[in-house]
Amino acid sequence: MIAMRRDVHGILLLDKPLGVSSAGAVARVKYLYQARKAGHTGSLDPLASGALPVCLGEATKFGAHLLDADKTYRVTARLGERTASADLESPVIETQALPALSAAAIEAALAAFPREYAQVPPMHSALKQDGKPLYEYARAGITREREARLIRIHELRLLDWTAPDLHFDVRCSKGAHIRVLAEDLAARLGTIAHLTGLRRLGVAPFDAEPLWTLEALEALSAPALAAALLPVDAALRGWRRLDLPAGGVEAFRQGQTVATADDEPGTVRIYAEGLGFLGLGEIRPAGRLVPLRLISAVANRA
């Protein structure tokens, strides 16, 4: 008998295990919750582990805000060796004798590393060209031209240097490819490198939140599974809040522009007494509040 899917709304902070694709991990979460709709907010390679926010139900409407969020990673890179994929997916194709590197020299290189630079995405990535992910071209031995993308590095912190393995944490903007960062950093140190370990520690704004493993979720009762979910609006903590007066609620929920006493322009989270979170709106000149993204009445009651 096929289990009936149901409406489940919220965000699960999954600790994706090694060896499992992001899509595969989401499928397991979707099955555990018997959810009609689920999606992740920024894939992790099978050889990476860690924070993977999974949006269920109406939370999927706001997943793009997590795609745009800053992320923090714990990185292990092996210096003096290069692979075609820049990680452990492919064999070593080049080795170099390591230059004399001290922890102090590496600290200096981390401090001097550009905080904003144009990074060329790797061929071994999920970015698509002509409808196919780049890694499919790479596995067929085809190299495609890739446009450099501006990324931001907010923090680089050395954890340990025990040659040839370099351990560091990085907090960066969306779109940053850590395997390319490791290669670029190695080049500044006069050598080559590839990733041997990668763990995503957090995704803003959830950096301090605990993560759930699949094994822990599988052991939970139905009520405990529900309690593990963050509310739909958790992804929007950084947005300004606006409480809508009762007189404008129905029109707003029907997608109509309503008046507001708040005339500061910008995107806001909208709430109503007794209903909670309604969605996102934009305050425009003359105190006009325009609906941008609304959740269903069912999700309000969930």
Language model regions located:
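Catalytic cores of RNA-modifying enzymes
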Residues: 1-174, 178-212
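Accessory RNA 3′-end/elbow-binding domains used by RNA modification enzymes
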Residues: 1-44, 48, 104, 188-302
